[in-house]
Each structure stands twice: as C-alpha cells, then as structure tokens.
Amino acid sequence: MRRYLRVVGLCLACGFCSLLYAFSQLAVSLEEGAAGGRRPQAAVVSWLADGGRGTGRGAGSAGPGRTGRYDMKTRPDEKMHLAVVACGERLEETVTMLKSALIFSIKPLHVHIFAEDQLHDSFKDRLASWSFLRRFDYSLYPITFPGDSAADWKKLFKPCASQRLFLPLILKEVDSLLYVDTDILFLRPVDDIWSLLKKFNSTQIAAMAPEHEEPRIGWYNRFARHPYYGRTGVNSGVMLMNMTRMRRKYFKNDMTTARLQWGDILMPLLKKYKLNITWGDQDLLNIVFSHNPESLFVFPCQWNYRPDHCIYGSNCREAEEEGVFILHGNRGVYHDDKQPAFRAVYEALRNCSLEDDSVRSLLKPLELELQKTVHTYCGKTYKIFIKQLTKSIRNRYDTPPKER
C-alpha cells in the first residue's frame, strides 16, 4: 500500500511539472507572436551579401539600421522613407527633388539614395549644407544588381532604372517606402502621400497612378506587346510600397502554375518578356500587377502629373479641381523649352533655398513666369501648377513656426 502511494505521489509530481512547462512554453510562443510575428521575411538572395546593401556613408547618415546624427529620436512608424535612383547627369535634378520634399514635410524623413559611385562625393557635399535640418537624414548606396544577370538589368530601358525593382530585397529592414524618379517635384507634404498607406486594404501592397487617363491617347492599350494593368497601365515614377507585404506575397504569374515571391519572379519575367518590353522596369511592374490586380492601390493623376496630362488638352480632372500634388517632368521637360510651365516650376524650386523667407517669396515670381506660358497647352491651365503649392506654403510657413 505504501509503495502504491509513493507511485501515485511521483506521478502527480511529474504531471504538475509537465503542466508548468506547457504553460511556460505557451507564454513564450505568445510573446514571440506579438513581438516578432510581423517581421519582414525577404527572399534569400546571395548577391546581397556581396554588395547589395548600402554603404550608409555620408553626412547625416550612420548607415542602414542606425540613426543618423541629424535624425530626431522617433519611433520607426513615425519616420517616412523615400528612395531615389540617380545615374549620369541627374545630381541637380535629384537635389531639387529632395529640396521640394523637405520644404513641406512634417514628419522625419529618411532618404535612401542609390547612385553611381562617382556621384557619391557630390551628394555628400551638397547635402552637408542641410545638416541643420533636424527632421532629415539619408543613406547612400551603390548601384547593385544580381551577379550573373547584372548586365541584363543595367541595359534595361535606362542605366540604373531597374534598380527600383530590387529595393524590397536590399532594404530588408524597411517596412514601407515611397520611390520616386529624379524628375519628381513635391508640391505638397510627403506626409500626405505617405498617409495613403493607411488606405490599403488587406491585399494591397503598392500604389501607383494610371499611365493615361484617356484611352484614346494611351500607350499600353494601343502598342504594348505584353500584359499590363487595367485599361491603360500604370506609371511607376511615383510608387508607394508596403515592402513587408511585397516580400511575403506569392505572386500569380503566366510562367508557372506555382506562385513566386518577389525575389524569384523578376529574372524569369525579364527572360520571357525582354524582347517585348519598351519601358523596362515599368513594363515588368505592369505585367506583375496585371496578374495580381487585387494587390495594387491606384491613386489619382494629381499625385503623378505629367506632360501627357496637358499636351493633348487637359485630361486630369482631379488636378483641375484641387491642383497638382506631385509634378513629374518626364521627357526631359525641365531642361528644354518644349513645356515651359513645367520648367518654370522646376527652376523656381531649384533656385529656392530652405530658408523660410525664400520659400514664402517664390510664389509671385513663379506665377509671373507661368503667365508667360499661356500660349502652350500646359500653360493654358497654369493655375493648377500653383493651386496646391500656394496652400502648402501657407499651411507650412504662415502658421506658428515649428522645429524643422
């Protein structure tokens, strides 16, 4: 009887210990799920270990994953991330774009600059004079493509243009990102387009504007030899991304019945369509989202206003009503006389300093220059170029000053 009681007691003790262990493991798993369940899972790409990561050098940056010396102490979700790719003669254009972003931005802004090696020192010199800006820091990165296929990617459309396709794989610690071309000008705070991330539904991973509003002058619907998104395709010059979702998603495609992740789909797409695409990386993005339309959020044309919206007559209704939010001077219109209205806005911001008085005083001279362009199609509606700009300056600079 005594032996029986000992056995029962031993079993009860073992059972109690097992119960305690089970509860402790459950608590640990719940903690991990809450703290780390949403960490980005990027595709494993071997070339990243050989230079795909940014150097992070330059004034105002302490490298990827570390805060720069001009960075305010903020939670990660408070900081906005902007990326640009600059090659060739794009230094001045890029600096002007960055200036337009900083003039109106409210939240801290971290800029990821991907540039050819010979441009790095020039960027550091130009941006060093902005070190007084408490809400701005940046990182410089080399132009990097996957090893065996680097030559194919470099000659796709324009030099370096396809670098943007690899941003989700290179910037693995960045959750969300706004990519813009160098020929972009912000006429309202970056914060406003950044806020569109909150409008994504559960399936959407990126946002772009339509390539055309009017199908009769559309390029994709008339000439494309590959799939494209929607009625007229999308333009990738302004692209807002939830990169965590992009890295996790398995994409439908027309190459295999299996769904592929971002790091696995790019090269097969290029191999299949490289003889049929005209606009390089933008065409590849159109192909991806043509098969995954539920993943794209489409914002109105005023967020990516181009010469095509006015050279054939005004065809961006939202810009007519509220003004241009983001100006996209593609086709080199900032640097020739074909579209003087676009060039006037670019020159005004290029010559503007980051001092408050300089920003306040740019409107009147700009309006006078725009009035000289009324003989052109885009100049006929010149007021849409300054409608939102006027509001942005008033809201940012005619209110009590805040630390910038």
Swiss-Prot record:
GO terms for molecular function: UDP-D-xylose:beta-D-glucoside alpha-1,3-D-xylosyltransferase activity; UDP-xylosyltransferase activity. It catalyses: 3-O-(beta-D-glucosyl)-L-seryl-[EGF-like domain protein] + UDP-alpha-D-xylose = 3-O-[alpha-D-xylosyl-(1->3)-beta-D-glucosyl]-L-seryl-[EGF-like domain protein] + UDP + H(+). It comes from the Eukaryota. Signal peptide: none annotated. Keywords: Glycoprotein, Glycosyltransferase, Membrane, Signal-anchor, Transferase, Transmembrane, Transmembrane helix. This is Glucoside xylosyltransferase 1. Gene3D superfamilies: Spore Coat Polysaccharide Biosynthesis Protein SpsA, Chain A. PANTHER family: GLUCOSIDE XYLOSYLTRANSFERASE 1, IP22168P. The keyword Protease does not apply. One of its GO terms (biological process) is O-glycan processing. Its main location: membrane. The gene is Gxylt1. It is a single-pass type II membrane protein. It comes from Mus musculus (Mouse). Glycans are attached at residue 201.
